[in-house]
Amino acid sequence: MALWRAYQRALAAHPWKVQVLTAGSLMGLGDIISQQLVERRGLQEHQRGRTLTMVSLGCGFVGPVVGGWYKVLDRFIPGTTKVDALKKMLLDQGGFAPCFLGCFLPLVGALNGLSAQDNWAKLQRDYPDALITNYYLWPAVQLANFYLVPLHYRLAVVQCVAVIWNSYLSWKAHRL
């Protein structure tokens, strides 16, 4: 519990920094899980650069974009009623999620050195499956998140659930 209290104090003092660092850390953890448990690479074959790429994406893209999106969404649809949460989830999953995945997957491809043509082909191959898989997990998570969780904790809650999602995304994004 002391760790949780320290996190809350840090979040209160430096909300943006803590949210971004949380996203980066949990993106990295998702990649480690992907490489070790899904792909079964072992420590000798672990691609540290790939993990650092995912941490960087978490800090430089996922944290700021998702954290910013939650702020915009809360301004656009203020309130925490069940109806408000449903509206937020529908906007999130109907508008934001498809765009986010459409940016995330090619960004990883570009960071991994794929040519524009290869990146486009990979996006065409992987995007539909990633989006469909997204819809198995995220609508229920986001509905609960928007209804039960205060704004300043939403990114952290989502990123905790997203450790598993990040493992999937890392595997999907790095699969050739």
Curated annotation (Swiss-Prot):
Tissues expressed in: Ubiquitous. Expressed in pancreas, kidney, muscle, liver, lung, placenta, brain and heart.
UniProt superkingdom: Eukaryota
Site, as annotated: Determines ion selectivity: D92
Result of changing P98L: In MTDPS6 and CMT2EE; results in incomplete closing of the channel
TM annotation in the entry: 18-38, 53-73, 94-114, 131-151
Record note on what altering Q93P does: In MTDPS6; results in altered ribonucleotide incorporation in mtDNA from patient fibroblasts
One GO MF term attached to the UniProt entry: channel activity
UniProt record, GO biological process: cellular response to reactive oxygen species; glomerular basement membrane development; homeostatic process; inner ear development; mitochondrial genome maintenance; regulation of mitochondrial DNA metabolic process; regulation of reactive oxygen species metabolic process
Coiled-coil residues: none
A Pfam family matched in the record: Mpv17_PMP22
Outcome after substituting V66E: In MTDPS6; uncertain significance
Keywords: Charcot-Marie-Tooth disease, Disease variant, Membrane, Mitochondrion, Mitochondrion inner membrane, Neurodegeneration, Neuropathy, Primary mitochondrial disease, Transmembrane, Transmembrane helix
Known outcome of mutating T80A: Does not affect gating properties of the channel
Record-level GO cellular component terms: cytoplasm; cytosol; mitochondrial inner membrane; mitochondrion; peroxisomal membrane; peroxisome
Primary location recorded for the protein, binned into one broad class: mitochondrion
Keyword Membrane: yes
Disease: Mitochondrial DNA depletion syndrome 6: A disease due to mitochondrial dysfunction. It is characterized by infantile onset of progressive liver failure, often leading to death in the first year of life, peripheral neuropathy, corneal scarring, acral ulceration and osteomyelitis leading to autoamputation, cerebral leukoencephalopathy, failure to thrive, and recurrent metabolic acidosis with intercurrent infections. Charcot-Marie-Tooth disease, axonal, type 2EE: A recessive axonal form of Charcot-Marie-Tooth disease, a disorder of the peripheral nervous system, characterized by progressive weakness and atrophy, initially of the peroneal muscles and later of the distal muscles of the arms. Charcot-Marie-Tooth disease is classified in two main groups on the basis of electrophysiologic properties and histopathology: primary peripheral demyelinating neuropathies (designated CMT1 when they are dominantly inherited) and primary peripheral axonal neuropathies (CMT2).
Function according to Swiss-Prot or TrEMBL: Non-selective channel that modulates the membrane potential under normal conditions and oxidative stress, and is involved in mitochondrial homeostasis. Involved in mitochondrial deoxynucleoside triphosphates (dNTP) pool homeostasis and mitochondrial DNA (mtDNA) maintenance. May be involved in the regulation of reactive oxygen species metabolism and the control of oxidative phosphorylation.
Name this polypeptide is given: Mitochondrial inner membrane protein Mpv17
